[in-house]
């Protein structure tokens, strides 16, 4: 046991599967030691609750030079303490360097020794040492302009250095101040006022098992073109043996219906319907205790005040998905406005929810349905079956009456009577019946008794049927056939009568 704990960590516990229980239970001293041991190790988050991704890039080697090619983005991505350090260090070095250049010019011209001579014109007036040169640079760079130190026209090198100082100072100011401004106005801070519920829930909604979580906007300013996406991160192994530690699957949160486009004025509940296309098709309350997955939620939109794109992220592990729960309502109608109570934003309550997966529910629904004969959905198969029945009728009508009774044609009405009387057989469709019965049953006003009586007459001895029992059209055809028979010669009429006798 100690070896297992060293391997899997302190989160390891011995669990057993029980056929009558609801899931996995810790193994007690009185239980069977032969039962299966399933180590349960806590999953390492890929995305924290605050949206930070737990990814560290290592062993880059020579690829680190790519960061210098995009120096501005590199500085913006640094933490604030490093930004402030670089900001102060850059200005300090630039000031000391330029002050040293002014001191070097004064030293090479001999202004430091001749500054107090009455008729001598120095390069920079009143610069006697390095501190005075540093103060002159600060007055020039910051455009303070006290007027006590100034450049004279007897120093061309000072004029060139002054131009270089102005250009370099403008570049440094634009780079560092721009970097600080971009970092302060980053839309990451806008994401701090976008809330996600602490837990996701699974319960029934509109008769379907649904995964739900809640999002909210704390500010009065809106998120323009807000869109939400969900990713399922789960490790799996391909049939070829390749192991994928972070396989990403898309969760449908309303792409086809447009429900992923949010009007985020008040808290909204995001829904993912679990169906045959969902990765959670096999997920049940019991299997959640052994599954390991992470649901990453990404909310994107444009900040109304700045026009910059903002993205907020969070994630839910299998331990943060509550089965059989529902969110408390947070919106109430007040006098002339709607009030949102954020104290109930994360609150949930239990609701009756089947503990089975959608796949298991569909299988149980099929098992509980009455046994029905397989319907012939193919038109070709239905046509062939009708032809077989017609051929069987032709064969039996040619037999003598005694053989017709032996073939069991009298038993057909009883079977049809049982089919029409039992309630469990009401699932039969008209496509499962012969074409003759379909035409009879499709006539309005034909009840089950009439259908059985007509079926009995149709399946009885055809020689006993009279013309009066036939429909009007068939009666006309039969009458026309009789008239045609009367017009035949005597020899043909005799042959026709001999054929039927």
Curated annotation (Swiss-Prot):
Q: What's a single GO BP term from this record?
A: response to electrical stimulus
Q: Which residues carry this modification: Phosphoserine?
A: 385, 424
Record Pfam families = IRK, IRK_C
Q: Which domain of life is it from?
A: Eukaryota
| Activity regulation note | Heteromultimer composed of KCNJ3/GIRK1 and KCNJ5/GIRK4 is activated by phosphatidylinositol 4,5 biphosphate (PtdIns(4,5)P2).
Q: Which residues lie within the membrane without crossing it?
A: 130-141, 142-148
Keywords, alphabetical? Glycoprotein, Ion channel, Ion transport, Membrane, Phosphoprotein, Potassium, Potassium transport, Transmembrane, Transmembrane helix, Transport, Voltage-gated channel
List the protein's name. Answer: G protein-activated inward rectifier potassium channel 1
- List the source organism: Homo sapiens (Human)
